[in-house]
Amino acid sequence: MAVPKRRKSRSNTRHRRSQWKAAAPDLVPIVVDGERRLVPRPLVRYFQQG
């Protein structure tokens, strides 16, 4: 039979959550319609296709 995990205190939960940071995407310069733009690397292909 399944056993519930130990409950974490509110303080521990909030300290753990506060350590999480979103990383900014690395932007690469590309030229679109003669204009230089900074776009996230995964989207470069779509910008070049049109």
From Swiss-Prot:
One of its GO terms (cellular component) is large ribosomal subunit. Residues 1-19 have a biased composition (Basic residues). Keywords: Ribonucleoprotein, Ribosomal protein. GO terms for molecular function: structural constituent of ribosome. Residues 1-21 are annotated as: Disordered. InterPro entries: Ribosomal_bL32 (IPR002677), Ribosomal_zn-bd (IPR011332). GO terms for biological process: translation. Disulfide bonds: none annotated. Belongs to the bacterial ribosomal protein bL32 family. NCBIfam families: rpmF_bact. This is Large ribosomal subunit protein bL32A. It comes from Saccharopolyspora erythraea (strain ATCC 11635 / DSM 40517 / JCM 4748 / NBRC 13426 / NCIMB 8594 / NRRL 2338).
